[in-house]
């Protein structure tokens, strides 16, 4: 779907953005419906993780100014006209000149469920040596109706700088692959998206990217839900950090600020009408299976996935005597990383937990 659209000055078409394969593009669509891509790699405004975003503006003569990003730099102001693309700011040069960033590569693999093509990215530690063995970290995106992509991510680079190979996939339900792919989780979430993530892990193991004995996992929001689901389904990970999760669709639906969005979209009916299905799709239903040492993290002002969701997992693991700790971040909303000090705190706690439970 398109977004951020503006009429051209002659009213003969619109400029808009859309996502394709984890890349946000700027396009022009005329009144006959013919479209043309004008720029790519829009974004870089999401400080923490490699989500889409960014903005653009079009002058009367069709010159476009937009925020451009890549794996290697946050957003920079860039101008494009019919002849050339020019980057006109270098805001990050001073910051990055003394930093060595990890290389990022795109990977594609097949889903074991239905043979669909699944896209992901792998970030390597700086000065990566393929002859060495590195811990392998899965980072699950939120949404789930969103996408990761070929964009700068401070969190990914911090994990890579700490010596981790970081894998971040776009399983089914992600945007930028068409309507049908995005709707595969309708009344079925979480489900085969879990298999898509694990298939990516196995792809990386088969291709010598990951060591099957050095696996770790984290993710926030819907990514926290996926992380909790993964450790409830298998014991392959050395340790996990579940950030601002949905743990219980019944309590989440009835306590979150967006309580009105779930009936007939995520699951069918209201919780009191479809109690068993709400429970069956809740990661808390799997807490009896979890053997993985797990840190749970949440912002204390989070209205989207309230602290009570995180505490359900924490208390369940405490009752089962599984190694766990609860990190509550004061004054933090659902967007924990919006405050840079919280971003650093988040990453530092995650790395400390993995170090404690290698």
Regions found by a protein language model. Give the residues of each.
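Hydrophobic beta-strand positions in blades of beta-propellers and related beta-sheet-rich domains
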Residues: 5, 26-28, 56, 77, ...
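Short loop/turn segments that connect beta-strands within beta-propeller blades
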Residues: 29-34, 81-83
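Conserved beta-propeller blade repeats
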Residues: 1-17, 43-67, 97-106, 155-157, ...
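Active-site-proximal cap/loop segments of hydrolase catalytic domains
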Residues: 168-358
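Cap/lid segment of the alpha/beta-hydrolase catalytic domain
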Residues: 83, 91-213, 220, 254-261
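Beta-propeller fold detector
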Residues: 36-42, 85-92
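A flexible loop/linker signature enriched in serine peptidases of the S9 family
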Residues: 1-2, 17-27, 44-49, 68-76, ...
């Amino acid at each position: 779907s398109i977004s951020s659209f503006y009429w051209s000055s002659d009213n003969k078409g619109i400029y808009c953005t859309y996502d394709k394969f984890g890349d946000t593009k700027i396009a022009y669509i005329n009144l006959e419906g013919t479209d043309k891509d004008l720029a790519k790699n829009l974004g870089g405004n999401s400080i923490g993780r490699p989500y889409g975003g960014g903005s653009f503006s079009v002058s009367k003569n069709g010159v476009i100014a937009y925020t451009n990003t890549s794996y290697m730099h946050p957003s920079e102001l860039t101008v494009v006209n019919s002849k050339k693309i020019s980057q006109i700011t270098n805001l990050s040069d001073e910051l990055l000149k003394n930093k060595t960033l990890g290389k990022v590569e795109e990977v594609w693999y097949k889903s074991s469920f239905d043979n669909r093509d699944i896209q992901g990215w792998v970030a390597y530690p700086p000065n990566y040596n393929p002859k060495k063995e590195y811990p392998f970290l899965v980072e699950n995106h939120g949404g789930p109706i969103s996408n990761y992509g070929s964009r700068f991510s401070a969190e990914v680079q911090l994990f890579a700088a700490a010596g981790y190979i970081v894998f971040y996939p776009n399983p089914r339900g992600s945007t930028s692959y068409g309507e049908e792919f995005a709707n595969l989780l309708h009344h079925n979430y979480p489900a085969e998206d879990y298999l898509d993530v694990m298939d990516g892990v196995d792809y990386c193991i088969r291709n010598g990217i990951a060591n099957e004995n050095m696996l770790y996992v984290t993710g926030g929001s819907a990514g926290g839900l996926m992380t909790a689901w993964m450790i409830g389904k298998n014991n392959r990970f050395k340790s996990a950090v579940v950030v601002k999760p949905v743990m219980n669709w019944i309590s989440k639906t009835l306590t979150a600020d967006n309580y009105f969005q779930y009936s007939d979209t995520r699951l069918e009916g209201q919780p009191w009408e479809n109690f068993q299905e709400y429970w069956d799709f809740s990661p808390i239903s799997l807490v009896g299976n979890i053997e993985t040492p797990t840190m749970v993290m949440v912002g204390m002002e989070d209205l989207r996935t309230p602290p009570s969701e995180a505490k359900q997992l924490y208390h369940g693991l405490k009752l089962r005597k599984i190694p766990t700790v609860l990190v509550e971040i004061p004054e933090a909303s659902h967007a924990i990383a919006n405050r840079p000090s919280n971003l650093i705190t988040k990453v530092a706690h995650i790395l400390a937990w993995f170090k404690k439970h290698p």
